[in-house]
Amino acid sequence: ILQISGERNVEKEDKNDTWHRVERSSGKFMRSFRLPDNAKVDQVKASMENGVLTVTVPKEEIKKPDVKAIEISG
């Protein structure tokens, strides 16, 4: 399971000649993701750019079964 948690602090301010408004939204958050069985958990990478979190989880290739032609007589 991949668990991501953090804290958000955002302040938005609007004003003109007659009024002034400030909105603040903040709080902690947590999100969990179930990873597939073939995830390479020791190679997980994360980066944040412009407020966007990108998490990369590489996966092992699933070996496809060998296909064998069988001759049918008759």
Curated annotation (Swiss-Prot):
Keywords recorded for this protein, A-Z: Cytoplasm, Stress response
Keyword DNA repair: no
Residues in coiled coil: none
Main location: cytoplasm
Domain of life (superkingdom): Eukaryota
Subcellular location: Cytoplasm
A GO CC annotation given for this chain: cytoplasm
Record GO biological process: protein complex oligomerization; protein folding; response to heat; response to hydrogen peroxide; response to salt stress
GO MF annotation list: unfolded protein binding
UniProt cross-references to InterPro entries, sorted A to Z: A-crystallin/Hsp20_dom, HSP20-like_chaperone, Small_HSP
Transmembrane segments: none
Every sHSP domain range: 1-74
Bias type Basic and acidic residues, positions: 8-20
One Pfam family cited in the UniProt record for this chain: HSP20
Keyword Signal part of the UniProt annotation: no
Region span, Disordered: 1-20
PANTHER family reported in the protein's UniProt record: HEAT-SHOCK PROTEIN 20 FAMILY MEMBER
Assembly description: Forms oligomeric structures.
Family that this chain belongs to: Belongs to the small heat shock protein (HSP20) family.
UniProt protein name: Class I heat shock protein
Species: Glycine max
